[in-house]
Amino acid sequence: MIQSPTSFLIVLVLLWCKLVISCFRECFVALHQLVQVLLQIINSNLQSRLLLWHSLD
């Protein structure tokens, strides 16, 4: 299957690139979920403050 060291290196580099891309994708998904959770927390916080503010009027 592998004839020379250069083709082996090419396969190695391609596999490494694939690994890096998948890691970046995982990190991106994790960051996206974290941002969504933070936005939900901020949103619920704002809603409770607005309710408190309206109840004081």
Swiss-Prot record:
<dbReference type="InterPro" id="IPR005214">
    <property type="entry name" value="IBV_3A"/>
</dbReference>
<keyword id="KW-0945">Host-virus interaction</keyword>
<protein>
    <recommendedName>
        <fullName>Non-structural protein 3a</fullName>
    </recommendedName>
</protein>
<keyword id="KW-0899">Viral immunoevasion</keyword>
<keyword id="KW-0922">Interferon antiviral system evasion</keyword>
<dbReference type="GO" id="GO:0052170">
    <property type="term" value="P:symbiont-mediated suppression of host innate immune response"/>
</dbReference>
<dbReference type="Pfam" id="PF03617">
    <property type="entry name" value="IBV_3A"/>
</dbReference>
<keyword id="KW-0732">Signal</keyword>
<comment type="function">
    <text>Involved in resistance to IFN.</text>
</comment>
<keyword id="KW-1090">Inhibition of host innate immune response by virus</keyword>
<feature type="signal peptide">
    <location>
        <begin position="1"/>
        <end position="23"/>
    </location>
</feature>
